[in-house]
């Protein structure tokens, strides 16, 4: 099979009428792509083409449709020859702005404290108290689907003004009596009275190393000292704060990778040790490197295999690695959409933190990747414990602090014994089921977030599924058959519906129908009336969710594993994946499947890859802290 002999004729027969020659709908022109070399020069185009062909969105309904074997020819070429023949290469080097959470965490690491706004007598999370997160606009997800992908984010005058205000506020607090201990940490010696010149030099040295995530030369430190002395007049501290603010407002602080050191040559090359340390720390911690990691980067030994592995393992064991679950895991699985109709903050906290604690356990305790789908343990407290039958008896009694009306109870790890048949894994957690109410939302979430399949947008003219007098006595599944009669709908719903209906025995709160879990509706069906059976596009059938889970753990294991690898790679690299990332994805996926690999194996595979450790320089980067 080849492009010229198989794919080009497919394009000429079914695509060029609208996407070539005089007419180029959607700004997609395929007419000039005649050879494999032409195809390789348009890598991003083929991803979009593959999606619309896979979803049968193209050709349009009113045009002659390819046969199934013709569709298969294109898909096989795209997966096996276009992606399969690619060489693993890093992407072009591009500095990117710190995301809001990265900026907040980095400011905390630089100063040793958070800028906070407290509401008296209100329980708040660290993020809710953060002045930074209240002032900075929320970063939208980039092309990768994650908010740390800020390559296309504009630095507006509004954001610049907010950076200036936050930098000034942090410096004012640092030099206040309240933060004398934090200031002494940066100075390195006890402060008695006014700062001496040696202490100012020490302060600038330590501060700049944190701000720029690498040490600056003594010449630059001396230049800063000269500016302070020339501007100080009668107020040395104000001049010092001005110089420190200058550093906090520099691109070298606000952007990742701005100070990367490169040979004068262009082309593919390893990133320097400090950039590698940054890539590791923002991947695992969403924060700047700590002192140990910076020290190893300075020694030039970070890329040595044993040293690199030891540091990665150390960082995963650190409490700071919880951000991998809270940031990556939450964005991947859309956990911010978990809600509670009861408007009860402590109950919502329990629903959200259950999957977060579970993901943190998987990521940091070296658990198998497929435990995401089926696990013998979960995390629960008295709120979520109601969904786990007698297994909740393992929970130790939590005593609420005196004088506190409401408190968020910590989760405890429990073994699933009595509830193992109905629970286990992330899919059947009450918060996940509750945010995806009904078979369509549940099936769509499972297909997209867990299995990584692409779904096109539904046709705009398809009406919602409503219940009328003629539908009395019909189940949702029966009423839905009319909707499925539309061929354009059936293409996606053949993939969505079996997954969603397999979860039909769980109510809107995520409780088991008939087990008095969650809020029970008056018109809820009896357990024996629920049809959980389904047939997947592969032809495999199941009678209930337990049988579907068995299919997910076997036949769909490769698809689920590959999606996990792709999602974490996008997050780690802060960008969408391209053709030259495919060999890394496939290599890590194969290794995990062959060895029943763990999340730690997955993380090590990404961090050790050429796309993580190297970069492509197309123009000599400037090293400047101005």
Protein language model features and the residues they cover:
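Short hydrophobic alpha-helical segments that form membrane-spanning helices or hydrophobic packing faces
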Residues: 207, 218-226, 257-258, 382-383, ...
């Amino acid at each position: 099979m080849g492009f010229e002999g198989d794919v080009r004729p497919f394009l000429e027969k079914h695509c060029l009428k609208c996407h070539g020659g005089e007419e180029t709908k959607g700004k997609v022109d395929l007419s000039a792509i005649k050879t494999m070399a032409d195809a390789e020069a348009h890598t991003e185009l083929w991803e979009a083409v593959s999606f619309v062909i896979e979803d049968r969105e193209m050709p349009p309904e009113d045009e002659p449709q390819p046969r199934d074997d013709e569709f298969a020819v294109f898909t096989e070429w795209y997966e096996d020859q276009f992606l399969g023949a690619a060489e693993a290469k890093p992407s072009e080097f591009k500095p990117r702005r710190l995301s809001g959470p990265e900026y907040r965490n980095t400011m905390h690491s630089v100063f040793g404290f958070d800028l906070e706004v407290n509401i008296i007598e209100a329980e708040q999370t660290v993020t809710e108290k953060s002045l930074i997160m209240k002032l900075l606009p929320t970063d939208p997800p980039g092309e990768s689907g994650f908010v740390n992908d800020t390559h296309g984010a504009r630095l507006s005058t509004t954001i610049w003004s907010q950076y200036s205000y936050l930098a000034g506020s942090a410096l004012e607090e640092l030099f206040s009596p309240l933060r004398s201990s934090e200031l002494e940490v940066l100075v390195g010696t006890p402060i008695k009275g006014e700062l001496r010149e040696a202490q100012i030099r020490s302060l600038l040295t330590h501060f700049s190393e944190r701000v720029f995530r690498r040490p600056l030369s003594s010449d630059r430190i001396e230049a800063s000292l000269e500016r302070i002395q020339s501007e100080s007049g009668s107020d040395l501290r104000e001049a010092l704060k001005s110089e420190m603010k200058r550093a906090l407002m520099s691109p070298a602080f606000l952007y990742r990778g701005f100070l990367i050191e490169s040979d004068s040559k262009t082309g593919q090359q390893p990133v320097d040790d400090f950039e590698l340390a940054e890539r590791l720390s923002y991947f695992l911690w969403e924060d700047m490197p700590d002192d140990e990691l910076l020290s190893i980067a300075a020694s030039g030994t970070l890329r040595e295999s044993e040293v690199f592995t030891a540091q990665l393992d150390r960082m995963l064991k650190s409490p700071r690695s919880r951000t991998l679950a809270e940031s990556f895991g939450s964005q991947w699985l859309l956990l911010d959409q978990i809600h509670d109709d009861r408007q009860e903050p402590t109950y919502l906290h329990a629903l959200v933190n259950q999957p977060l604690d579970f993901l943190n356990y998987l990521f940091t305790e070296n658990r198998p990747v497929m435990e995401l789908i089926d696990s013998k343990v979960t995390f629960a407290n008295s709120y979520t414990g109601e969904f786990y039958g007698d297994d909740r008896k393992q929970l130790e009694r939590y005593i609420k602090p005196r004088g506190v009306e409401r408190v968020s109870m910590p989760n405890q790890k429990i073994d699933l014994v009595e509830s193992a048949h109905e629970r286990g894994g992330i899919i059947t957690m009450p918060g996940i089921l509750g945010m995806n109410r009904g078979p369509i939302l549940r099936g769509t979430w499972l297909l997209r977030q867990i299995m990584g399949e692409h779904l096109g947008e539904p046709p705009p003219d398809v009406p919602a599924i409503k219940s009328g007098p003629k539908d009395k006595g019909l189940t949702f599944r029966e009423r839905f058959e009319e909707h499925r009669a539309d061929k354009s709908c059936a293409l996606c719903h053949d993939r969505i519906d079996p997954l969603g209906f397999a979860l039909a025995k769980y109510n809107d709160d995520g409780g088991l129908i008939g087990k008095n879990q969650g809020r029970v509706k008056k018109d809820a069906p009896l357990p024996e009336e629920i049809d959980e059976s389904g047939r997947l596009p592969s032809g495999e059938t199941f009678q209930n969710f337990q049988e579907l889970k068995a299919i997910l753990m076997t036949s769909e294991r490769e698809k689920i594993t590959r999606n996990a690898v792709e999602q974490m790679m996008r997050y780690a690299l802060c960008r969408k994946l391209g053709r030259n990332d495919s060999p890394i994805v496939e290599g890590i996926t194969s290794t995990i499947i062959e060895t029943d690999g763990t999340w730690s194996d997955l993380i090590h595979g990404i961090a050790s890859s050429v796309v993580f450790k190297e970069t492509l320089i197309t123009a000599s980067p400037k090293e400047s802290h101005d």
